């Protein structure tokens, strides 16, 4: 594993309106809002049962508000793959299944505790028991749990209290190259994600790494020449804000500051 302990990065959220607003309010300084990105240990098949760094991985992502899964779609003989070949759909499915398995274990343990209390005459947990069974049915069918399926606020509150991994918003980051095999992997990943009601953003990390030393204007010109509209990090930040349901607003502050 390249990553053992979580690495935390704080990035500014891109907002094209800031410069224009700064001129309007005559602010001397702008403080953009930020987003915390956490790079955690990779996941392998069997992580829900402790394989690899599974227990550590699951513990780390339980603390996150949303998940971004980087999926390899490119070929490179110098970079090995744990399964010996590149298959984007398989890799995405492994992650999703491990999250489902972990939640099945969480819910079944909770179900056992509630069953004992119900048998002793405690009827207050009857609704929670019904919700657990409904969630288990969803997970056993291979689907993630969607809170918008539930209209009752109390039901949503109870489900959130389970701290399930499959309730968290998730999207895929497809790390691609310009080969035909990479394009096929990207297409396959898009089809899989569509079926799971999850989004995919396309990035070329190697290309951006190669031009990282260029100044901002040269970097922008190069990306445009390659048909890339914006840097990978910007795409990731924007998608993260979107799936978290965050709103971005700006307000003038004292001492000539403008805070986003």
Give, region by region, the residue ranges found by the protein language model:
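Conserved C-terminal guanine-recognition region of P-loop GTPase G domains, centered on the G4
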Residues: 60-66, 70-197
């Amino acid at each position: 594993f390249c990553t053992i302990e979580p690495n935390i990065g704080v990035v500014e959220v891109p907002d094209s309106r800031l410069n224009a607003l700064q001129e309007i309010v005559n602010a001397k300084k702008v403080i953009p809002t930020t987003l915390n990105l956490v790079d955690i240990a990779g996941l392998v098949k069997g992580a829900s049962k402790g394989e690899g760094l599974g227990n550590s991985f699951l513990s780390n992502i339980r603390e996150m508000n949303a998940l971004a899964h980087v999926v390899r779609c490119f070929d490179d003989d110098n970079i090995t793959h744990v399964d010996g070949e590149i298959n984007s759909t398989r890799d995405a499915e492994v992650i999703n299944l491990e999250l489902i398995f972990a939640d099945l274990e969480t819910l079944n343990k909770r179900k056992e505790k509630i069953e004992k209390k119900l048998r002793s005459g405690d009827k207050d947990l009857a609704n929670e028991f019904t919700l657990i069974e409904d969630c288990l049915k969803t997970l056993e069918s291979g689907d993630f749990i969607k809170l918008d399926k539930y209209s009752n606020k109390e039901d949503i509150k109870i489900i959130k209290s389970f701290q399930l991994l499959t309730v968290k918003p998730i999207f895929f980051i497809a790390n691609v190259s310009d080969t035909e095999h990479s394009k096929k992997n990207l297409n396959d990943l898009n089809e899989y994600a569509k079926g799971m009601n999850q989004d995919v953003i396309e990035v070329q990390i190697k290309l951006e790494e190669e031009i990282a030393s260029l100044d901002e204007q040269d970097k922008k010109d190069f990306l445009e020449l390659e048909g890339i509209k914006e840097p990978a990090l910007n795409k990731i930040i924007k998608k993260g804000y979107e799936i978290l349901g965050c709103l971005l607003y700006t307000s003038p502050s004292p001492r000539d500051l403008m805070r986003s």
